[in-house]
Amino acid sequence: MASSEQEILAGLAEIVNEETGLPTDSVQLDKSFTDDLDIDSLSMMTIVTQAEDKFSVTIPDDEVKNLVTVGDAVTYIAGAQA
């Protein structure tokens, strides 16, 4: 079953919180993973792997570089679930 964008955002916020300790309310659609949330490439790969498991999607390694903002990730996951 496909998740709504709000459900995906909430799920990603939980994953980011678990990985980085950032408050879930700081994970917003317009936030950059690297510039705003200070997530490095290793943490990003962990977040991607957890998101794949949580949302039952596959995010190819070469697609991860295109997930600049939280909104990019939400849009990608929503599209992959459709």
UniProtKB/Swiss-Prot annotation:
Carrier domain residues: 3-81
InterPro entries hit by this protein: ACP, ACP-like_sf, PP-bd_ACP
GO MF, any single term: acyl binding
UniProt cross-references to Gene3D superfamilies, sorted A to Z: ACP-like
List of residues that carry O-(pantetheine 4'-phosphoryl)serine: S41
Changes after translation: 4'-phosphopantetheine is transferred from CoA to a specific serine of apo-ACP by AcpS. This modification is essential for activity because fatty acids are bound in thioester linkage to the sulfhydryl of the prosthetic group.
Entry keyword set: Cytoplasm, Fatty acid biosynthesis, Fatty acid metabolism, Lipid biosynthesis, Lipid metabolism, Phosphopantetheine, Phosphoprotein
Pathway: Lipid metabolism; fatty acid biosynthesis
Gene Ontology cellular-component annotations: cytosol; membrane
Keyword GTP-binding in annotation: no
Gene Ontology terms: biological process: lipid A biosynthetic process
The UniProt record lists the keyword Cytoplasm: yes
Cellular compartment(s): Cytoplasm
Function field: Carrier of the growing fatty acid chain in fatty acid biosynthesis.
Family (UniProt): Belongs to the acyl carrier protein (ACP) family.
Alphabetized PANTHER family for the sequence: ACYL CARRIER PROTEIN (PTHR20863), CARRIER DOMAIN-CONTAINING PROTEIN (PTHR20863:SF76)
Protein name in UniProt: Acyl carrier protein
Species of the source: Beutenbergia cavernae (strain ATCC BAA-8 / DSM 12333 / CCUG 43141 / JCM 11478 / NBRC 16432 / NCIMB 13614 / HKI 0122)
